[in-house]
Amino acid sequence: MVINPSLIISTLNLGILAILLGSIFFFSKSYFSNENPSLPINKAASAHLSINNKSEAIEYNSGPFAMAILKALALLSVISLLVAINTEFSDINITLSLWLNNTPTNISLNFIYDQYFLIFLSIALIVTWS
């Protein structure tokens, strides 16, 4: 089986974007609720509970884990950028309309990976990590 460099680049970039999209939900700062539960809450090493008069907030400190994820994603984006530079990569167009065809409207997602996107993604992840 021949490994195509464009396949490596598209797989790395789709993985980076999926992890970034998933991290929106897992690395949020706090969750608010107006209820006052009577059950005791166990404290984890990365979470603490603060109670105000009006609301209760459970805050999660996921800083070190989020920074490690950003470091790994920055490294992966630099690897995909170096593969693209070494193979004289031009661009890839990935269309995800076949996966979303069960809806009454036509939904089509197009990802265009060119050198500008690869440079932007690498710089953005390195700046966010630092």
UniProtKB/Swiss-Prot annotation:
It comes from the Eukaryota. One of its GO terms (molecular function) is NADH dehydrogenase (ubiquinone) activity. Its EC number is 7.1.1.2. It is an enzyme of class 7 (translocase). The keyword tRNA-binding does not apply. It catalyses: a ubiquinone + NADH + 5 H(+)(in) = a ubiquinol + NAD(+) + 4 H(+)(out). It is found in: Mitochondrion inner membrane. Keywords: Electron transport, Membrane, Mitochondrion, Mitochondrion inner membrane, NAD, Respiratory chain, Translocase, Transmembrane, Transmembrane helix, Transport, Ubiquinone. Its main location: mitochondrion. The chain crosses the membrane at residues 7-27, 65-85, 107-127. It is a multi-pass membrane protein. One of its GO terms (cellular component) is mitochondrial inner membrane. Belongs to the complex I subunit 5 family. Core subunit of the mitochondrial membrane respiratory chain NADH dehydrogenase (Complex I) that is believed to belong to the minimal assembly required for catalysis. Complex I functions in the transfer of electrons from NADH to the respiratory chain. The immediate electron acceptor for the enzyme is believed to be ubiquinone. This is NADH-ubiquinone oxidoreductase chain 5. The lineage of its organism: Eukaryota, Metazoa, Echinodermata, Eleutherozoa, Echinozoa.
